[in-house]
Amino acid sequence: MPRSRINGNFIDKTFSIVANILLRIIPTTSGEKEAFTYYRDGMSAQSEGNYAEALQNYYEAMRLEIDPYDRSYILYNIGLIHTSNGEHTKALEYYFRALERNPFLPQAFNNMAVICHYRGEQAIRQGDSEIAEAWFDQAAEYWKQAIALTPGNYIEAQNWLKITRRFE
């Protein structure tokens, strides 16, 4: 039984119903429908914290999905899971791959900035201010890209950029 049919969450059920209706009325191939089913099941598992199951579904969706835009969201969600698991190098890789397919994902730029900022803070704790500054500079670049895509968002990042004099 597909995961979407066993999930008890009202929002997930509503999303599943709407998605199923759209899949019936929008002309798509069976491969696209199957890819979306795996993607939807991956999102459901991810929202419940079942990351291993979510990854399996996302990898299967990636195998089937051919549209670069849709693939970007699958890759982004894989990056989210790796971020949640503390696997920052892997997360960055997936965010980069998502952005290669869809450069208009401000949330990917934001998450990359957060990881770089975190690494900068780690470097400070280890007493390496030079490496910390490099990480903070990289975080600033990613936040600038996120802000350029969605100027009204990421207010905390905008404040950090101004306070640290990294905002142009």
Curated annotation (Swiss-Prot):
Membrane topology classification: Peripheral membrane protein
Main location class: plastid
TPR repeat positions: 35-68, 72-105, 120-153
InterPro entries named in the record: PSI_Ycf3_assembly, TPR-like_helical_dom_sf, TPR_rpt, Ycf3/AcsC/BcsC/TPR_MFPF
Gene Ontology annotations of biological process type: photosynthesis
Intrachain disulfide bonds: none
GO cellular component: chloroplast thylakoid membrane
One Pfam family, short name: TPR_1
Record keywords: Chloroplast, Membrane, Photosynthesis, Plastid, Repeat, Thylakoid, TPR repeat
Cellular compartments annotated: Plastid, Chloroplast thylakoid membrane
Keyword match Plastid: yes
Entry's family note: Belongs to the Ycf3 family.
NCBIfam families: PRK02603.1 (NF002725)
Role noted for this protein: Essential for the assembly of the photosystem I (PSI) complex. May act as a chaperone-like factor to guide the assembly of the PSI subunits.
Protein name: Photosystem I assembly protein Ycf3
Taxonomic source organism: Eucalyptus globulus subsp. globulus (Tasmanian blue gum)
Primary gene name: ycf3
